[in-house]
Structure formats: structure tokens, C-alpha cells
Design a protein with these regions (language model features):
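Transmembrane signal-anchor hairpin modules in multi-pass inner-membrane enzymes, especially those
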Residues: 1-108, 118, 122, 142-152, ...
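Membrane-interface micro-motifs in multi-pass membrane enzymes
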Residues: 2, 51-60, 122-123, 182-195, ...
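Alpha-helical transmembrane segments of multi-pass inner-membrane proteins
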Residues: 10-19, 64-69, 100-112, 128-136, ...
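Membrane helix-loop boundary segments at the extracytoplasmic
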Residues: 32-42, 342-345, 379-422
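A membrane-periplasm/extracellular boundary helix in multi-pass inner-membrane enzymes
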Residues: 70-75, 163, 225-230, 247-289, ...
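Membrane-interface catalytic loops of GT-C/OST-like multi-pass glycosylation enzymes that act
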Residues: 118, 122, 231-234, 332-336, ...
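Long extracytoplasmic/lumenal interhelical loops at the membrane interface
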Residues: 175-176, 181-183, 273-275, 283-345, ...
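Hydrophobic transmembrane alpha-helices and their immediate junctions
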Residues: 255, 260, 345-394, 417, ...
């Protein structure tokens, strides 16, 4: 019953809250559902004859959020918490916004040009959902407080996923992800959700104050254990490599170094012989059939993209032909986010995707550079959210080399947070910049007050 109560309360907050308070609440609940996937984990829970798995919770929240955003930005209706714009104005569209729009347009073009539109249709629908909510989010997220709201809600969902994975294992020895996947994601996709939550937890701890901040650190060991239980070598390796970036971005490096030592010991304790064997087989490419299969599909993807460089074979059409190109079994996926994009939608799509990711990281760098001279608490919090989002994205980008996750919503959530963070910091910097001085007068230095960003 408690699961149904949770769903009804969040549904009310996401729908009515979008109109009464702010569309930020609807967006946050929509993204919570995207990460939590309640129809999967609670599919058999019901109350008064109504099962959680029978309702389209995300659809109701999405429609309410889109409607409230349209009415608000069209000037027809203003929810109470967004009746006035921020003091620095609405964040402008940046290069990253336009690159994402270009990527969206090109991916959409590869649906009507697909070899099989029937095959492409369900995956195209998933793209439309992701793109629509991403674009909607760029109009909704206007303050740092908005970004933190989404950040914490999504992080809570990811931590709960880790809790469920651990609960299934501890109560019955069942490896949920390895046996069943997670709500349409295979073990690799679900493991990345949990792995991306690790740097998010650390930088949430760094940004917070009070005793409850330690709950973020306490959540990390169960998350690590959940990643191990996934048997996803891609997620394990991505998290290990991202640890270096987390260390570079951390403010208290000595404390983090101690945490790394403790974490290393915990991983050795938590990882059984099967997990250790699974992880260390990454380096045994000559005997690892999985790695050899990936190498083969990568070569196939390059051939496909070279033959159809503009539009590719069509969204998710490459799986239909990998066997004809020499894959070991029919329907074999490419197992690389980047090469899958090239095979399905052409080299142009991959170029736009790469440019967008590059612009995103440049934007995060510029945001940190603006804030670097300032040590007030609000500026440090903004630096923390930038670091948390950046490290989560680095982890995804590493994992995407060997995993095919083009409809994976978690990175798109991080992307929109990164894009809007850069837009907000640019808007603040522009507003606080001193006016241009007359030619005969020296320009007076301006005082940047980044702490105001949080309002």
C-alpha cells in the first residue's frame, strides 16, 4: 500500500504542483519516474484493485508539465513560484542548446529515411519523449535552486534503485540486474544509473551542511555493491576511471583520499570470486568472447556508416542487418553508443552528438572558471553541482564506448542540468559585468556576486 500512496502523492505533486507551484515539480517527478521505473519495481503492488503497473504515471505528469510550461511561457498563466523572472532575466540559449536542437532534428530525419520504419517507430517514440522533455526543461530551469531540485530528486531515485538491487540479493541471493535487467534496461544500463549516482552523492555531500549531509556518503557503499552485483564490467571500469576526475574536482582531497582507501577495502570485501573474475577478464581480450564480439560489431558499424554516411540505416535498424554483415547471432547490437548512432543515423548524427558533448563540457569548464575566485558558500555549492554533473557525464561517456544506450534517460537529465547551469552563470556574469567605459575613461572593475545565483 505504501508504494501506491507514494505514487499518488508524487502524481499529485507532478500534475497539480506544475500549475499551482512551478513546472519544476512536474519535471522533477517525471525524471524521478524515468530513473525509478515504478511500473517495473512495483508492478504487482496494488490498492483497491488498481495495480501500479497498469497506470501511465509518466504520461500524466509529462502532459501536465508541458501544458503548465506552455501557459506560463506564453504569458497566459503563471504558477505562484515562477510569477516573476530571476533578477538576471531568463537564461539565454547557448551554443549547446543549438547543437542539441541540430542533433534532435537530424535524429528525427532518420526515422522517415529508415530502411524499416516499423522497426524504427518504437525507438523513435522514445527519442521524441526524451527530446520533448529536454527542450521543455530548458524553459523551466532558470535558477540554481531549480537545478538542485532536479539533482536531488533524481539522485534519490538512483539511490533507491541501488537499495532495491541490494535488497533482492541480501534477502534471497537473487541478482536482479543480471537475471532480469531493470525496467527495459539491461544490466549495463541499470548499472550506469547506479554508478552515476556515486559522484552525484559525493558532490551533494560537499555542497550540503548539517548532519544529514553524511547520508550522501553513507549511500555510496550500497551503490558500489549494487554496481558489483550488476556484473557490468563497463559500469565497473567507467566508475574506476571516473574516480580520477572526482579526485581532481574535489575540494577536500585528503578526505577523499581516505574515502578511496576505505572504499577500496570495502570493494575487496564485497566482491566475491565471481565478480573479481568477471572484472579482471576485461584485460583478457584474447579469451574474452564478449570483447571479441564487440570488436566485430564495431567494425560492422563502421562499414554500415560508411555505406550510408548521411542518414544511416535508420533508428535501431542496424540490428536487423548485423548478422548479414558477419555478426555471430541475428539481432546483435553494436554495443557502442557512438558507433550505434553512426550506423543508425549516419556520421552526421555522430558528429553533432560529439559536438554537443564537447560544448557541454566546455560550458561546465567556463562556469567553474567564472566561480573559481569566489569562496562564499553559495558559489561553492554551484561549483559542487557543476562537478557532480560533470563527473556523472564523464562516467557515462566512458561507458558509452562499450555500451549501446541511446534511449537511456539518465545522461540526458545530466545534460540538461549542465546546459542550464552554463546558461544561468552566463546570464549572471553578463548582468553583473560593468558597463563599457567611455574611451577617455578607464573601465572600473566590476564586482561579481555569484552567491546571488542561488536565488
Amino acid at each position: 500500500m505504501k508504494q501506491m500512496v507514494f505514487m499518488l502523492v508524487t502524481l499529485l505533486l507532478g500534475t497539480a504542483g506544475s500549475f499551482a507551484l512551478s513546472p519544476v515539480y512536474g519535471l522533477s517527478i517525471y525524471y524521478l519516474y524515468a530513473v525509478l521505473r515504478p511500473q517495473f519495481i512495483w508492478e504487482h503492488h496494488e490498492f483497491a484493485g488498481m495495480a501500479i503497473g497498469d497506470m501511465q504515471w509518466s504520461l500524466y505528469v509529462a502532459l501536465a508539465t508541458l501544458a503548465a510550461t506552455f501557459l506560463w511561457r506564453a504569458g497566459l498563466f503563471a504558477p505562484s513560484k515562477v510569477s516573476a523572472p530571476p533578477w538576471y532575466g531568463n537564461p539565454p540559449f547557448t551554443r549547446s542548446h543549438y547543437l542539441f536542437m541540430a542533433f534532435t532534428a537530424w535524429i528525427s530525419l532518420t526515422f522517415p529515411t529508415a530502411v524499416s520504419t516499423d522497426r524504427a517507430w518504437p525507438f523513435f517514440v522514445e527519442y521524441v519523449k526524451i527530446f520533448t522533455m529536454f527542450i521543455c526543461a530548458t524553459f523551466i530551469l532558470r535558477t540554481i535552486r531549480d537545478l538542485w531540485t532536479v539533482y536531488f530528486v533524481v539522485l534519490g531515485g538512483a539511490v533507491y534503485v541501488g537499495y532495491e538491487i541490494n535488497t533482492y540479493y541480501l534477502n534471497g541471493g537473487w541478482l536482479l540486474l543480471a537475471s532480469r535487467g531493470y525496467g527495459g534496461l539491461d544490466n549495463n544500463g541499470a548499472a550506469l544509473i547506479v554508478a552515476m549516482a556515486v559522484p552525484m552523492c559525493y558532490f551533494a555531500w560537499e555542497a550540503s551542511s548539517g548532519w544529514w549531509r553524511w547520508l550522501f556518503l553513507l549511500a555510496i557503499p550500497p551503490l558500489l555493491h549494487a554496481v558489483l552485483l550488476s556484473y557490468s564490467r563497463g559500469a565497473m571500469a567507467s566508475l574506476g576511471l571516473t574516480a580520477f576526475v572526482i579526485f581532481l574536482r574535489a575540494r577536500n582531497k585528503k578526505f577523499l583520499g581516505v574515502c578511496y582507501l576505505i572504499g577500496f577495502v570495502l570493494v575487496l570485501i564485497m566482491a566475491g570470486p565471481e565478480i573479481r573474475e568477471r572484472f579482471f577478464s576485461i584485460g583478457k581480450a584474447d579469451v574474452d568472447e564478449s570483447f571479441q564480439s564487440r570488436q566485430n560489431t564495431w567494425a560492422i558499424a563502421i562499414r554500415m556508416a560508411n555505406e550510408r554516411p548521411l542518414f544511416g540505416l535508420g533508428i535501431r535498424n542496424s540490428n536487423l542487418f548485423t548478422y548479414d554483415y558477419g555478426a555471430d547471432i541475428p539481432g546483435r547490437s553494436i554495443h557502442s553508443q557512438y558507433l550505434q548512432t553512426a550506423a543508425d543515423s549516419g556520421w552526421v548524427a555522430l558528429l553533432l552528438y560529439g559536438l554537443f558533448l564537447g560544448s557541454l563540457f566546455v560550458g561546465l569548464y567556463r562556469s567553474r572558471r567564472i566561480l573559481r575566485p569566489y569562496t562564499d558558500p553559495e558559489s561553492l555549492k554551484v561549483q559542487s553541482i557543476a562537478s557532480g554533473v560533470e563527473c556523472a557525464m564523464v562516467l557515462f561517456c566512458i561507458g558509452a564506448f562499450a555500451l549501446s544506450l541511446e534511449h537511456f534517460e539518465m545522461p540526458y537529465i545530466m545534460m540538461v542540468l549542465a546546459v542550464q547551469l552554463n546558461a544561468i552563470t552566463r546570464a549572471v556574469a553578463t548582468r553583473l559585468a560593468p558597463p563599457a567605459a567611455a574611451p577617455s575613461q578607464p573601465a572600473m572593475p566590476g564586482t561579481f556576486r555569484p552567491g546571488i545565483v542561488a536565488s
